[in-house]
Amino acid sequence: MSERATYAARRVLPDAPLLAAAEGRTPGRRPVWFMRQAGRSLPEYREIRSGIGMLESCFDPALVCEITMQPVRRHGVDAAILFSDIVVPLKAAGIDLDIVAGTGPVVANPVRSIADVAALPRLVPEEVGAVAQAVQLLTAELGSTPLIGFAGAPFTLASYLVEGGPSRNHERTKALMHSDPRTWHALLGTLADTTITFLQTQLRAGVDAIQLFDSWAGALSLAEYREFVLPHSERVFAEVESAKVPRIHFGVGTGELLGAMGEAGADVVGVDWRIPLDVAARRVGPGKALQGNLDPAVLFAGPAAVEKQVRRITAEADAALAAGATGHIFNLGHGVLPDTDPGALTALVELVHSL
């Protein structure tokens, strides 16, 4: 994967607040969007997804377009994020997995040996052609709103493959990385290739930014992250650098890893709700924008509590900017919870824009 991809001209969105903040320019307003904004919190999403499986939905370009647009229409957020799932490129490549309701991704044949790694199918762009088509539909419909593409980071994909599904302790994953580093790095190298192909496909189709989700990285120590994960995430960001779009890096529970995550090459580092943004800025170091970081559960506490926390976060973000951060994108510290009142999200967007 050493060759740098070439990308056709994409939309020019000089006034988009999200792109301005991500690129270190001054936005016309503080940008805000939400991870998992297209999802079960919206009644229109539940209606359109009725009877259609998650993975089936992700390979239907018209459905992906409609679901991605729903929160943009309803909330007035400053970005759309492509409706997909981090295991989509694995499924597209031919890995036997499914998303089981109430559980998450379940892998039929977990990866536990170098032979298992060698047997993994490699993703080719044509296998995610439906995703590219969805991106093209969206860029034609979104007007001046940027579209964020995304992929799962190699470590998080590896954890699903090694564990066979979601894991609380990641014991098999950690056992493999420590006991058999050769197999571990071969696996992450293969998954980095998959992630790169998936992101490059989205970039060629016209996404305006990308986010790399390392959902499970918070399970790692800093030493583990640096030795076993950072080189592979670093390669992903390097391989999409030539697209010249903002690159966002996010993980949950990664307060102690923020400095290393910042080194991976992203322009924006996502921060969960456990660490103040001004503290995060010192850990990440100057020259990066920050994204975050309202606790999703606060949205259940009522308008007064939400406003109090939003004002605290924006003040901490302003302190982060004074400390060397190059921008702030307001977001939650993780995804929108399924039972969140959509009206609370709309009000949150209006509040952030008013400050």
From Swiss-Prot:
One Gene Ontology cellular component: cytosol
GO function term, MF aspect, one: uroporphyrinogen decarboxylase activity
Pfam entry (one): URO-D
Enzyme Commission code: 4.1.1.37
Site keyed Transition state stabilizer: positions: 85
Catalytic activity: uroporphyrinogen III + 4 H(+) = coproporphyrinogen III + 4 CO2
Alphabetical keyword list: Cytoplasm, Decarboxylase, Lyase, Porphyrin biosynthesis
Transmembrane annotation, as ranges: none
Main location: cytoplasm
SUPFAM superfamilies recorded: UROD/MetE-like (SSF51726)
BP terms from Gene Ontology: protoporphyrinogen IX biosynthetic process
Compartments in which it is found: Cytoplasm
Pathway assigned in UniProt: Porphyrin-containing compound metabolism; protoporphyrin-IX biosynthesis; coproporphyrinogen-III from 5-aminolevulinate: step 4/4
InterPro entries: UROD/MetE-like_sf (IPR038071), Uroporphyrinogen_deCO2ase_HemE (IPR006361), Uroporphyrinogen_deCOase (IPR000257)
Binding site for substrate: 36-40, 85, 160, 215, 334
Entry's family note: Belongs to the uroporphyrinogen decarboxylase family.
Subunit (UniProt): Homodimer.
Main function: Catalyzes the decarboxylation of four acetate groups of uroporphyrinogen-III to yield coproporphyrinogen-III.
Official protein name in the record: Uroporphyrinogen decarboxylase
Organism expressing this protein natively: Rhodococcus jostii (strain RHA1)
Lineage, opening ranks: Bacteria, Bacillati, Actinomycetota, Actinomycetes, Mycobacteriales
